[in-house]
Amino acid sequence: MPLPELLAPAGGFDAAVAAFQYGADAVYAGLDRFSARAEAQNLSPERLAVLLAHARSLTPPRKVYCTFNTLLLDAEIPAALETLDGLDDLGVDGVIIQDWGLFELARRHFPRLQLHASTQMAAHSREGVRALAARGFTRVVLARELTLDEIASTVRDRAAEIEIFIHGALCYSTSGICLFSSHAVGRSGNRGRCAYCCRDRLTEVGKPDAAAGHPYSMRDLAWLPHIPALVAAGVASLKIEGRMKSPLYVAAITDLYRRAIDGTLTPADEARKIADIQTIFSRPWTSFYAEGTGADPLAIIDPSAVGHRGTRIGTVQSVLRDGRGGRWLRFRTARALEKHDGLQVEPAAGGQPAGFAVNALRRCGATRDEISLPAGSDVEVELPPDLPASPASGAAIYCSASQAVRRSYPIETVRESSLAPLHACAVTVTLEAAGLVVTAEATDSCPDTATVRIPVELTPARNPGQTEAAVRKAFDRTRDAGWRVARLEVHDPDARYAPPSLLNDARRRVLEALTAARAAHRQAARNEALAHSTLSLDSPSAAVSERTHKEHTEPLFTAKVHVLQAPSEGLNDADELVVQIGLADDETVRRGLAAWLTVVPRDRIRLALPLLVRDSESAPLDTRLRALAADGWRHWECADIAGLDRLRRCVAQAEDITADWSLYALNRAASDFLCEQGITRRVTSPEDTEANLTLCADVGMIEALVFQLTPLFISQTPPCTGSGDPPSGSVAFADRRGQTLHTCSLDGRWITTGGRPFSCADAIPGLQRLGIRHFRCDWSWQPSDPTVLTAAWRAVRCGETPSGSHSANFRRGLL
C-alpha cells in the first residue's frame, strides 16, 4: 500500500525549506492576500516562484499547494482573478478554496488548476465529499470532527482524494462557520483575521464562586498514535496545521510524523521527540474524536490555561533567597538544562503560567554558575526580579524553550542561483544562408510561441561539427530570462556558421518575445474573466413559485424558526415561515409542523435542512425527507451543497430551493454559482456589510438577513464549566466586560449565541432602493421567549432595530 502524502505548513519560505528538509512530501503556503492565516509571514508571488523551483529541484520532486481559502467580498474579485492567473502561470500543484465564487472563477477560466476543498467547507460525510467532487474538486480536506471510522468510510467511497489534519491547533467551532471573531471585533475567521475569541477568559453566569476559566479553549490535535490506522485506511494526505509556527517547529513536527509514517519511530525516539517539540510550542494534546464522538470534553478542552506550555521537567521544591535578595528556584530537572533555556511554572490553582529565561543556573547549594547541567541534576535557577510572586512548592515546572533542541534541527540555506526557472520551452534554431530563424514554444498547457528572424549573411562553417555545441551553449544561458530550454533542435542543412554574439542576441530576443506573448495571452484571459465576473446576473429562474417572485412594492418578510420551538402567534403575518427541521425524529417533526400550521398556512411555509449532517445521521434524514415530500411539502431550504444534492435526491417534487447564509455568497460570482445550481434565493451572511451588499444587490436573488440570534460557535463539543462537567442542556458565560454568551444543545451540536442579537433592520428602506425585496429574521439557533420574539418581529417590520441589538459588520466593515 502506498504511503500517504505528508503535508506540512509553510507560513514563510524558511518554514517550507525546513518542511522539505525534514521529510514533507508537500507544503501548503499562503500568499500576501486571501489566506486563512492572514497574519502568517506568507509569500509574495516572487517567493512562491522560488519555492516551487526549489520543490521541483529535490529528489523526488515535492509539491506546493497554495491556500486561497478565504471568503471574498465583491470588490476583491479583480484582485482574486489576478492572483488565480498568477498561480496558474506558476503551475502550483493545487489551490485550496473555500469561496464558491472563487471556485466558479477558477473552474471557468483557469481549468488547469487542481482545486482542493478547504476544511472551511465543513465536509462532514461521504455525501459532503461527493457533492464537492461532483462540482469539480479533486481533493477534499475533511472537517476535523470526524472519527477514524468515518474517515475510513469516506476514503472507501473514492469520490475524491481525502486530506485530513493530524496535528495542530483546533477551533472550538466547526471550521468555516465560526462567526464569533467577526461579530465581536470585525475580524473574520473566514477571511484569515481570527481574533481567537474562543481562548477568552470567562466566568460561568449564576456561579459566583466559580473561578474564571477558558471554557471554549481547545487542546491541540495530535493523532500520532493513529498514524498506522490512517495509512491502512488509504488517506491520501496527512496534514499538519501550523502556518503561524516557526521554521524550527515545522522541522521538528515534520520529522516526527515522517518517521511515524515510515515506521521508523522507536518508542524511545517518540518520547524524546515529543518532549523536544513541546519545548518549541505545545498546548496539551488531544485525540479529539478519533475513537468516537463520546470523548470526555476535558480531554478535548483545557479550561485552565491558554498558549504555549512546554514539556514537564520537574516540581518546585522551594524558593531560596541569596545575600543580595535574589530568589532561586530549586528543583530536580528531568532533562538537561542550559543557560538561556526557557521555563514556565504553572500555578497549583491553575491560571496562566509564569514564564522566564534561565539567565543564571547552578547546582543546588553551589555558588558558581553553570552553563549547562545534565538531566537528573538538583538545580537552582535565579528568578527574574520582575516576577511578582514566588512559585509555590509543588507547582509544576515546564521547559518552554531549549537551546539544545534548536541545535538539533539545523535548517539548510537554499542556493537560489542554482535553481532552474519554472517555465520550460522548446527551441528550434535554423541556420540559413540568409540568416538565423529561432522559434520558442512554451511546453506547458498555454500555447505561447514566438519566432525571431535575424537577416544576416551566414558564411559556411569551417568546423561544422561544432555548430550544434555552440548553439546549445548559447541557449543554456536562459535563467535570467525566466525560461529553461527543455528541448533544443538545431537545423543546419548547409553547414553555416553563426558567431556566438549572434546566437546570444537571438536567444535574448526570442525569449523576450515569448515572455511578451505569454503576458499578452494571460492579460487577455484575465480581461475575459473580469468581464464575465462583472456581468449582472439574470433574473432568478421562472420556475420559482409565483408567491415568491411576483412583483412587490412592499418588502416581504421571512421568519426562520426551529421545529422544536413553541409556535408564536406573533409571526402569523410572515410572508414566509422557514421551519428548520433539524435532526429531530419523525414524530417530533410532524408534531412541530402541525403546531406551526396553526399560525401560518402551509403555502407560506418552507422547510429547512440542518447544516451539519454526519454519516450516521444521513439515512434517517433521507427517510424523513421522503416522508415529508409525500405529505406534500414542496418548498425547501438547504444550508450547504450536500444538502442541495440531498433535496434533489429525496424531494424530486421540490418547486424551489433557497440557500441559507452558510452557503456563503459575498460576491456576485458566488451568487452566479448558486443560481447555476438551481438556487432561487439566497440569504445574506451575518458577516456581510452594507457596502458589499450595495455591489451585490443587482443579482436579484438576495434575501437580506436583518435580524438573527447569530450562532457564533457551532460545535460538536460542549464547553467546560467551572465544575469540569459538561452542561446538562445550556450554560451562560460572561467576560470581564459583562458581555454574555449562551451555549445550548441543539440537534446534537452545541450552539453559542451572544447576549445581543444582530440586526440591521433600520437599513431596510435603503436596501429596498437597491432592489432587495426579501428580508429575514432568524430565531432558529436558540429558543426565544415568544413575547421577546414578537416585539423584535414588530420592530423589524417597521424598519426599526430592536432594542439591545448590534449591527456587527454591517456598517463598520469587515476585515
Per-range role (PLM):
Residues 1-123, 141-146, 150-237, 244-396, ...:
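Active-site pocket-lining/capping segments in soluble small-molecule metabolic enzymes
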Residues 127:
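Short, conserved phosphate-binding/catalytic loop or strand-edge motifs used
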